[in-house]
Amino acid sequence: MLEKIVAAVRAAGDMIRDAHNIERDTREKTGAADLVTKYDVAVQEFLHRELLGICPEADFFGEEGQHTTLTKDWAFIVDPIDGTTNFVRELHYSNIAVALCCRGEVRYAVVYNPFIEDLFAAEKGCGATLNGRPIHVSGHDAAHAICMCGSTIYDRSYTDRSFAIMRWLYDHTLDFRRFGSAQLD
């Protein structure tokens, strides 16, 4: 199953890697910091077809519409382009993310940055890989090893609370970085 999901996500990656005139085909979704492009929609439509072809008994929940009430045991959860602002600005730090859940529990997950061809894949109980190589937690003390990463929120009314949390994280870890793609961060 994981290999089939990976193949679909890689094919979708070709669509965004080859994108042109991105800014022209962009609109605001909920505000200036929450964008959607024609590529978000096209990638989601492609993944909708491909993933339900792999697992037709699953529901499909995508960020760019096509929301459905999840009534089946299995469900695909899809973010067609995470880091859309980066994508629009042609900063190659965006990704496609797909999870296949069973009764609310993630069983398979894939996060793919097609610009640098980094593909993270995981199957519950089998570990995670980066480009096919197993990855592991380092085992170092968190305060000296973790560079916390985070993303902003679209609702500015949460800014003070969000920054307070970031400050606490900064004080309790090695460093804090924010690159604009929550899943890659």
Regions found by a protein language model. Give the residues of each.
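Short, isolated positions in well-ordered beta-strands
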Residues: 107, 135-137
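Short secondary-structure junctions
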Residues: 24-27, 128, 173-177
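DPxDG-like acidic metal-binding loop motif
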Residues: 70-129
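An extended, acidic
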Residues: 137-185
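N-terminal subdomain of lithium-sensitive/metallo-dependent phosphomonoesterases centered on the IMPase/IPPase/PAP
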Residues: 1-81
